[in-house]
């Protein structure tokens, strides 16, 4: 019989990609669930997925037995299939330097000092820990956009988790908005990636812009331009 492993769900995302993103880890510790999350203004999907796994592993002492559950095949295959070859070639792939090498090397060092079993799980398939990590990563992205400290873990006891329940019904008013064909298509694609309707996606974007106000929107746009 192997060691008793602490189960961890790690998830990250970015919208648009590249753009503002968030990461999260849900640690099912014996003493209770620990939740970590954060975000960055200018990043990518893969960097947020890697960051989620890194922040989760940083929570544990060396030698800890962990089962890391991720819905990112990029993360799982990087560690379990590709990394050994990259290291043998001096952190290079067959076509050039390893992408996100800073995070890959950090992840490699952390995993080497711990007993980690890597498990891929299908995203948005109803697995509670994965769904929770996904919602927290979304919250991390929103907080990064609102100017809160990004990239720092914020542990939460299970009974003090941030409220992420669906919004209560409110009175609505229909407003017609004319969009260019390109913008309408981009909106539809982004909503599809987020798993929501274009109307809900647009409403969320409008609310966020109203919260940020013009100076905040300008700051986010400048960060994205620097990252591009």
From Swiss-Prot:
- Essential cofactor(s): Mg(2+)
- Please cite one Gene Ontology biological process associated with this protein: DNA replication, removal of RNA primer
Citing just one GO molecular function, the answer is: RNA-DNA hybrid ribonuclease activity
Q: Which Pfam families match?
A: RNase_H
Q: Does the keyword Metal-binding apply?
A: yes
User: Residues in domain RNase H type-1?
Assistant: 2-142
Recorded catalytic reaction(s): these are: Endonucleolytic cleavage to 5'-phosphomonoester
Q: What is its EC number?
A: 3.1.26.4
Any one cellular component term from GO for this entry? cytoplasm
Cystines in this chain: none
Which keywords does the record carry? Cytoplasm, Endonuclease, Hydrolase, Magnesium, Metal-binding, Nuclease
Q: How does it assemble?
A: Monomer.
Q: What is this protein called?
A: Ribonuclease H
Q: Which residues form a coiled coil?
A: none
- Protein family (similarity comment): Belongs to the RNase H family.
Q: What is the species listed in this Swiss-Prot or TrEMBL entry? A: Methylorubrum extorquens (strain PA1)
What does the entry list as the binding residues for Mg(2+) 2? 11, 134
Compartments in which it is found? Cytoplasm
The record's comment on cofactor binding reads: Binds 1 Mg(2+) ion per subunit. May bind a second metal ion at a regulatory site, or after substrate binding.
Q: Which domain of life is it from?
A: Bacteria
> For binding Mg(2+) 1, which residues are annotated in this chain's numbering?
11, 49, 71
Question: Gene of origin?
Answer: rnhA
Q: What does this protein do?
A: Endonuclease that specifically degrades the RNA of RNA-DNA hybrids.
Transmembrane ranges, per UniProt, are none
